Amino acid sequence: MPLPAVSFARASTVGLGRVRRAAALGGILALAATGALTSASVASAAESGGTYVALGDSYTSGPLIPLQSGGLCLRSSVNYASLTAADLGYSLVDASCAGATTDNMAQDQTDFGSVINPPELDALTGGTSLVTLGIGGNDIGFSDIIETCAGESLTDPFGDPCTARYTVGGTDQLLAAIHATGPKVAAVLREIHQRSPHAAVYVVGYPDILPEDSDGCWPIVPIAYGDVAYLRQTETELNAMLAGEADANGATYVDTYTPTVGHDVCQPVGVKWIEGLIPTSPAAPFHPNALGEAAMAKALESAIG
């Protein structure tokens, strides 16, 4: 298989600004026809068990999975929040937005120089009964990491060029970013409890992205063989941080990693729940597809009980 060009790898990675631009320019999935300009999509179950507010980034919103709403936030009608609300009888307020960081929980999120989503925490009320928070990946620069590692893989596909780049000088830059994000997640959780004191709060972790039992599938997924273990460990550390902050701040952690092992980006169509560089089903690159969102919903529903 011919090697992908660096420019192609960069253009196809998970920078959600790029995904949003594609959606805006091409009208992907008829966003306008599905209520694209709303600030927070609301879906009501027939028999409401209360109000559920979903906060988070693109792993919550489900970019490019039909049907889309929420404008440039790229929310799917079958993301895990929507599925959980329907299954458990909640009225859903989906405030999630592709590209969100912890800062966007309390601040406007902007793109193209315009506000695309108000502060996600503004969706909370004193009557909110369920809150999920899926955040942190963009704080550590997930999109930039994938883009950087894809480019580095072309220089040494059988080595570990990305690991070397992020650990130069003996300091693991990604681990440091995870540690720096922990207090931000804690602050968000405290604010959730302040605004919705009666709500059950769940922190949703990130699913398995890279294979556990191999060194990857370069060049189909352009991560150098020697970098797969490092990036997998980085995700493990991110999830561990989220679990720790949930436990320390009155929330329940939802493990979506364990139940998705074996459904990573290197698996064949129908088995993989995370899409690779070139998606084979409607979803953003390196993000859950509809099967992945369904698996995350199942994990969340199991945690809720």
Regions found by a protein language model. Name each.
Residues 100-118, 264-280:
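Charged, often glycine-rich, active-site loop that binds/positions anionic groups
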Residues 207-305:
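Catalytic His-Asp segment of secreted/periplasmic serine-dependent ester chemistry enzymes
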Residues 45-99, 150-156:
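Serine-esterase "nucleophile elbow" of acetyl-processing enzymes
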Residues 84-92, 183-200, 234-255:
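A structural motif corresponding to the C-terminal end of an alpha-helix
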Residues 1-45:
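Secretory targeting and sorting signals
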Residues 40-51, 115-132, 185-200, 301-302:
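Short amphipathic alpha-helices and their capping/turn segments at secondary-structure boundaries
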